[in-house]
Amino acid sequence: MLDGYTIKVVKLPPDNEETAIQGLKLLVELLDRYPENIIDSPPRRHLDETVLELVEKSETPVAMQLKEELKGLTEGGIAIKRVVFLMPIRGVERFYFLLIQDKKDPAYYGKIVTPKDTDKVLMRWKVSDNEYRVIYGDLHAETVTKEKLAELEAALPK
């Protein structure tokens, strides 16, 4: 180790439903809404890069706190703070990408579902031939049959 330097170890959260919900919760706290897309928003950009741009314009308490905590930090300090703070958001992105990779038929409706939509599907993925896991707009989750999912998705705003 070099004198005068500190090594910061950042542990990645697991790529699972719980991490995705934590990341979605943080997104709402930062932006007061869900992002329109989780992946490719725009193409070849990470979700947290897009979020950082949106946070600059946001006046939610959590966004204001983050901006205040970044004041006076060195460039390296800002980078570390952002990585640690935004880790749950990267978790949403990684989990969704894993669902795509594993061919779990995921879908995300952040463009039309809000945190107030307690009965609307925000995100879903296949867990078996006849069942899907659903995260609703208020971030509660449950397993539903594919028939129930079809009803829920038919009720989404157009």
PLM region spans:
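Conserved hydrophobic/amphipathic alpha-helical signal-anchor segments
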Residues: 1-120, 130-132, 137-158
